[in-house]
């Protein structure tokens, strides 16, 4: 994933110093894009080992429409712990918006179900969009959505996805987000009888926290390994029926994990 390292190097060399909500401080650039051809391998970072279990379970948690960390905790995933209240609740975050977006007239929209139906019925539509950014509920969320909106595109029997990430924590968050949405693209492609195409990652405020600079420099000294393969259980034909056991990662070789603090 040389593209990811190129982004990290660009921010280190050309980024502007900025303050931020957490008080940590960042080095930041505005606007960046990376494209991953999913036929060439699963875009899971190899210059530091990632916890694939957390990536898969978090995505399944989103798809369930869940907004309480109990499911994550039950499966050994702690990435949302810092933002949950004493009951484990996060407010109307991703799962709520993906599955139960509340309209002005009181209806509830299942954006994921609507998306699948739209891709199957009218693949050439330019409206295959899911948004997690709900201005009416942002203030009630423990953390407003960083990966805010994604769009699917069908051409030549292949399904591609583009994500817009308004706030991109390059060292900790972005590797998870790339893998998560690449996996979602593969899942949606399978249930819609399409082949995975490209995953396009588009970032807004792309930043390295000041307490991640040393770790970023360390990672830039490492040479990427070939990408692994992600195998999905071909018998699953319903997006909402996928389970953790339906995913098999093959050939993942990675450099050791690099620890870094989370900015809350």
Swiss-Prot record:
CDD domains for the chain: TS_Pyrimidine_HMase
Molecular function in Gene Ontology: thymidylate synthase activity
One term under GO cellular component: cytosol
Superkingdom as given in the UniProt entry: Bacteria
UniProt protein name: Thymidylate synthase
Localisation: Cytoplasm
Assembly and oligomerization: Homodimer.
Protein's UniProt keywords contain Protein biosynthesis: no
Functional description taken from the UniProt entry: Catalyzes the reductive methylation of 2'-deoxyuridine-5'-monophosphate (dUMP) to 2'-deoxythymidine-5'-monophosphate (dTMP) while utilizing 5,10-methylenetetrahydrofolate (mTHF) as the methyl donor and reductant in the reaction, yielding dihydrofolate (DHF) as a by-product. This enzymatic reaction provides an intracellular de novo source of dTMP, an essential precursor for DNA biosynthesis.
EC number(s) from the headed UniProt entry: 2.1.1.45
Catalytic activity entry: dUMP + (6R)-5,10-methylene-5,6,7,8-tetrahydrofolate = 7,8-dihydrofolate + dTMP
Major enzyme class: transferase
Record family assignment: Belongs to the thymidylate synthase family. Bacterial-type ThyA subfamily.
Keywords: Cytoplasm, Methyltransferase, Nucleotide biosynthesis, Transferase
Source organism (scientific name): Azoarcus sp. (strain BH72)
Keyword field contains Transferase: yes
GO biological process, any: dTMP biosynthetic process
Pfam short name (any one): Thymidylat_synt
Active site: 146 (nucleophile)
Pathway: Pyrimidine metabolism; dTTP biosynthesis
Ligand binding (dUMP): 21, 126-127, 166-169, 177, 207-209
Residues holding (6R)-5,10-methylene-5,6,7,8-tetrahydrofolate: 51, 169, 263
